[in-house]
From Swiss-Prot:
It is a multi-pass membrane protein. Residues 81-111 are annotated as: Disordered. Residues 1-31 form a transit peptide. Induction: By light. This is High molecular mass early light-inducible protein HV58, chloroplastic. It comes from Hordeum vulgare. The chain crosses the membrane at residues 165-185, 209-229.
Length: 231
């Protein structure tokens, strides 16, 4: 009977201990429920006498009651939520930094090109020689054909007139050369004066054809011995 009372009291104590709530901190804590192993030893002595004949014998019985209680740890929900939110929150490195605003570079000051000298303009690769020769060739080709048609003399006869022919040639060459050099020495270009069909490229090609025409005219008259207009 005493054993039952002891067990009942132990069970009541254990039940009340199990029902009592464990107050745990709300944030960043772990709820720990720990119980120990309890061993209950109950000794009971029983005196037995069979029919009163045999001497009484004492029987001692021992009741061992072992209660194994386990320890387990339960994480707090708030701390678990904080851990989850901390793991899912973006790191500062994931934020894209705004690209720096590019400041446009200041325009370089336009330096005025120096005017070429006479020797630069009259150089073999300069702008003056081919253009001046082309203009003189165009004027000479038209003048040679006009004189042949008017007087009947060939190109070689016209060059042989040292008094009038050579004077006209030198005067025409001087005027056209000076008129072509002055704009170049002032820094102007022929391309800046081009408009429509009066372009710099057209003038170059016409001058080249005129130079070839003068050479062909002189060669033809020398071979045939007669002016080109009479052939």
């Amino acid at each position: 009977m005493a054993t039952m009372v002891a067990l009942s009291s132990f069970a009541v104590v254990g039940r009340s201990a199990a029902r009592s709530p464990v107050v745990a901190p709300r944030r960043r804590t772990l709820v720990v429920r720990a119980q120990t192993e309890v061993s209950l030893h109950v000794a009971r002595t029983i005196t037995v006498s069979v029919f009163g004949c045999l001497p009484a014998s004492t029987i001692t019985s021992r009741l061992d009651l072992t209660v194994n209680l386990f320890v387990y740890v339960q994480p707090d929900m708030d701390s678990a939520k904080e851990t989850t939110s901390a793991s899912t929150s973006p790191s500062p490195s994931q934020y894209t930094s705004p690209s720096p605003t590019t400041i446009p570079a200041a325009p370089k000051p336009v330096t005025k090109k120096a005017n070429p000298s006479v020797w630069d303009a009259l150089a073999f690769s300069g702008p003056a020689p081919e253009r001046i020769n082309g203009r003189l060739a165009m004027v000479g080709f038209v003048a040679a054909l006009s004189v042949e048609a008017a007087r009947g003399g060939g190109l070689l006869d016209q060059v042989g007139m040292w008094s009038s022919g050579l004077a006209w040639f030198l005067a025409t060459a001087g005027v056209f050369s000076v008129a072509s050099l002055l704009p170049l020495l002032q820094g102007q270009s022929v391309e800046s004066k081009s408009s429509g069909i009066w372009s710099a490229d057209a003038e170059l090609w016409n001058g080249r054809f005129a130079m070839l025409g003068l050479v062909a005219l002189a060669a033809t008259e020398f071979i045939t011995g007669a002016p080109f207009v009479n052939i």
